[in-house]
Amino acid sequence: MSIVNFKGNPVKLKGNSVEVGADAPKVNLKAKDLSVIEIGAAGKTQIILSVPSLDTPVCATEAREFNKKVASYNGAEVIVVSMDLPFAMGRFCSTEGIENLSVASDFVAKEFGEKYGVLINEGALEGLLARAVFVIKEGKVAYKELVNEITEMPDIAKLDAFFGGSSCCGGCGCH
């Protein structure tokens, strides 16, 4: 069990913490159109952004920032996961012009939260997801950042470095 902070106060997380190098747990989540989005499948690269709710300022900013940066991640599929209802996620994407990434809801079974160890288990945000970033390559966890303070953004510079930097042409290493 991991612990993060919410406004400086420790909060316990429920579920199994996944580590870099481990097989990525496969889970099915609901997209904004109620179709299924599979997390953890082999054959692709996924950047998973776990957030408490798109209806909070920090989460909304994170989604907007990553929406702008998707092209710099060498064809990786970027998915924002929260407990928001798919309909609310769709409205958020429409209102904010989010078109370059996917949103997925874990509201049905909280399977993502438990299998990735980011389900908040106590306090005011109990039942929501902690802020984290996972990169899944070929079905394996290749990168993980569990953000210590839920109200803060993940370290985007570290993720950029993982993908080879953020050059003008998408981190391809040609500069």
From Swiss-Prot:
Annotated source species: Campylobacter jejuni subsp. jejuni serotype O:2 (strain ATCC 700819 / NCTC 11168)
One GO MF term attached to the UniProt entry: thioredoxin peroxidase activity
Homology family: Belongs to the peroxiredoxin family. Tpx subfamily.
Protein name: Thiol peroxidase
Cystine connections: 59-93
Miscellaneous comment in the UniProt entry for this protein: The active site is a conserved redox-active cysteine residue, the peroxidatic cysteine (C(P)), which makes the nucleophilic attack on the peroxide substrate. The peroxide oxidizes the C(P)-SH to cysteine sulfenic acid (C(P)-SOH), which then reacts with another cysteine residue, the resolving cysteine (C(R)), to form a disulfide bridge. The disulfide is subsequently reduced by an appropriate electron donor to complete the catalytic cycle. In this atypical 2-Cys peroxiredoxin, C(R) is present in the same subunit to form an intramolecular disulfide.
Keywords for the protein's UniProt record, in alphabetical order: Antioxidant, Disulfide bond, Oxidoreductase, Peroxidase, Redox-active center
Residues of the active site: 59 (cysteine sulfenic acid (-soh) intermediate)
Family matches, as InterPro entries: Redoxin, Thioredoxin-like_sf, Thioredoxin_domain, TPX, Tpx_CS, Tpx_Peroxidase_subfamily
EC number annotated for this UniProt entry: 1.11.1.24
Catalytic function, reaction form: a hydroperoxide + [thioredoxin]-dithiol = an alcohol + [thioredoxin]-disulfide + H2O
Gene3D superfamilies documented for this protein: Glutaredoxin
Signal peptide: none
Thioredoxin domain ranges (all copies): 18-165
UniProt gene name: tpx
PROSITE patterns referenced in this protein's UniProt entry, alphabetically: THIOREDOXIN_2, TPX
One Pfam family matching this protein: Redoxin
HAMAP family: Tpx
